[in-house]
Amino acid sequence: MVLFGVLTMILAIALFSLRIPAIYFNRITIILLLFSALLSYNSLYMNNIGSGVGVFGGLFQVTTITQSIDVFIYLLGALVLLLSEKANRANTLSFNKLNSTLVNKSKGLSVLAEYPLIALFSVLGMSSLISSSDLISMFLSIELQSFAVYILATIYRESESATSAGLKYFLLGSLSSALILLGSSLLYSFTGLTSFEGLYMLCSTTETNTAIEISVLLIMVGLLFKVSAAPFHNWAPDVYDGVPTVVTTWLTTMPKIAFLVFILEFQGFTQLANWSSWTNLLLISSLLSLLIGTIGGLAQYRIKRLLTYSTISHVGFLLLALAINNEESVESFLFYLIQYSLTNINVFFILVAFGYLLGSKGLSIYSPIQLINQLKGQFKVNPLLGLSLAICLFSMAGIPPLVGFFGKQMVLYAATHNGNFFLAFVAILVSVVSAAYYLRIIKVIHFDPVPAPSALSLIKTTEISSDLNVTETNNSLEGSSEELSTSSSLVIATITLLLIFFIINPTPLLNSVHLITLNLFYW
């Protein structure tokens, strides 16, 4: 369905982009993703899907977990695309027929007609990746979604910081793809096989070969690079901070889901979890991610860089669950991935909402909220948004009874039950330390006074002018703020309520991840 949508959108944009406002393409894409989610959900009731259904000559294998994650990816993709719809009223928008964009007269923002198309390409690559059962389909899927996110990072060509960040993303992402391709080539040269099933049979019947181990570890290093796990994380803070906030929302959430689920399936298909070298690599990366993500975040004063280091820390929890690879850990991995993805998206929804409230006082037309100090006193401006952000940050910190606490508790229980007491202790320690920078944001929002216009001007001329990553500043401090759209308000309210009231009825989500885990291990 997504492939059909991609082909249809290519034709529609080519033929009708000069006559149809670009925002309509965005809404059509959202409807398409929702319908794709419905189709994937219905496919879960097929009789043979539990054991896996091979398609395209075995290049892809459709299973319960692939279809379940497809539903999640499609729904999240539809939510993120809502952010690209401007919160302006209809009379403040005009259609520019020269470049097929919908232009906001007050600030020069635009909704690109190509944005939803590229997002669809990215979703298609993610869906293909988690269903891959062959080295060839794996690499093609990785490149399909990678090229899409490279373009997304640089799609706003007026932004110099986004162009710089996108170039860095492309160059270093190409390096990780080269490592994956090198590992795949070596693996094929040593085994003569590309299918995961064939590799599983070979590894089960023969002794472990050092050359094969090196090949697989090269693939794993490339995948860890893609999810910005330490020590392969250095590109992430600059890239996520440089691109527009709307694009950052996509980059920090969507690709990571696909890559992490693929790692889970890859080690399940090939029984790599039984290799000590594979497990040790995951454990070392998990430990470094926990430490670097926490310590690095303490020194940040830019909100998106801080959230990037927070993401690195959470990736450490996910890698810890992957390294253990038993029923408890896989269940905790899926639960943690779902709850963190929802929380992270909600945080960026709220940041975009605060950017609307700032209006022309924002530091950039693409990323109005860049500094933590810009959020001073925003609780007094909009108490509900301030409270929602506090709830999300408390959940990320693992404060009970929010859903983030149960995610960390499940991972730590699996780690201690498997004998990884040291890593469990480190995870508890970094959770306590990371609460410091979450509480710093909450303190700025709720207890600091609203800065005067002169203070905002000082921020512009001193802090921002010295930062090479920010060049699209909005020089006007006067002007009205924009209104938050009803759809964005509904998304923020719904996710926030889910974080709060999960404890009242946790059965649906817990049962779902439990059934997926049982299917993965016992079908």
UniProtKB/Swiss-Prot annotation:
<feature type="transmembrane region" description="Helical">
    <location>
        <begin position="110"/>
        <end position="130"/>
    </location>
</feature>
<keyword id="KW-0679">Respiratory chain</keyword>
<keyword id="KW-1278">Translocase</keyword>
<feature type="transmembrane region" description="Helical">
    <location>
        <begin position="306"/>
        <end position="326"/>
    </location>
</feature>
<keyword id="KW-1133">Transmembrane helix</keyword>
<feature type="transmembrane region" description="Helical">
    <location>
        <begin position="170"/>
        <end position="190"/>
    </location>
</feature>
<dbReference type="Pfam" id="PF00361">
    <property type="entry name" value="Proton_antipo_M"/>
</dbReference>
<feature type="transmembrane region" description="Helical">
    <location>
        <begin position="490"/>
        <end position="510"/>
    </location>
</feature>
<protein>
    <recommendedName>
        <fullName>NADH-ubiquinone oxidoreductase chain 2</fullName>
        <ecNumber>7.1.1.2</ecNumber>
    </recommendedName>
</protein>
<dbReference type="GO" id="GO:0042773">
    <property type="term" value="P:ATP synthesis coupled electron transport"/>
</dbReference>
<dbReference type="InterPro" id="IPR010096">
    <property type="entry name" value="NADH-Q_OxRdtase_suN/2"/>
</dbReference>
<feature type="transmembrane region" description="Helical">
    <location>
        <begin position="333"/>
        <end position="353"/>
    </location>
</feature>
<comment type="similarity">
    <text>Belongs to the complex I subunit 2 family.</text>
</comment>
<keyword id="KW-0813">Transport</keyword>
<feature type="transmembrane region" description="Helical">
    <location>
        <begin position="246"/>
        <end position="266"/>
    </location>
</feature>
<dbReference type="InterPro" id="IPR001750">
    <property type="entry name" value="ND/Mrp_TM"/>
</dbReference>
<dbReference type="GO" id="GO:0008137">
    <property type="term" value="F:NADH dehydrogenase (ubiquinone) activity"/>
</dbReference>
<keyword id="KW-0249">Electron transport</keyword>
<comment type="function">
    <text>Core subunit of the mitochondrial membrane respiratory chain NADH dehydrogenase (Complex I) that is believed to belong to the minimal assembly required for catalysis. Complex I functions in the transfer of electrons from NADH to the respiratory chain. The immediate electron acceptor for the enzyme is believed to be ubiquinone.</text>
</comment>
<keyword id="KW-0496">Mitochondrion</keyword>
<feature type="transmembrane region" description="Helical">
    <location>
        <begin position="212"/>
        <end position="232"/>
    </location>
</feature>
<feature type="transmembrane region" description="Helical">
    <location>
        <begin position="3"/>
        <end position="23"/>
    </location>
</feature>
<feature type="transmembrane region" description="Helical">
    <location>
        <begin position="281"/>
        <end position="301"/>
    </location>
</feature>
<feature type="transmembrane region" description="Helical">
    <location>
        <begin position="135"/>
        <end position="155"/>
    </location>
</feature>
<keyword id="KW-0830">Ubiquinone</keyword>
<keyword id="KW-0999">Mitochondrion inner membrane</keyword>
<keyword id="KW-0472">Membrane</keyword>
<keyword id="KW-0812">Transmembrane</keyword>
<feature type="transmembrane region" description="Helical">
    <location>
        <begin position="30"/>
        <end position="50"/>
    </location>
</feature>
<feature type="transmembrane region" description="Helical">
    <location>
        <begin position="62"/>
        <end position="82"/>
    </location>
</feature>
<feature type="transmembrane region" description="Helical">
    <location>
        <begin position="419"/>
        <end position="439"/>
    </location>
</feature>
<feature type="transmembrane region" description="Helical">
    <location>
        <begin position="386"/>
        <end position="406"/>
    </location>
</feature>
<dbReference type="GO" id="GO:0005743">
    <property type="term" value="C:mitochondrial inner membrane"/>
</dbReference>
<keyword id="KW-0520">NAD</keyword>
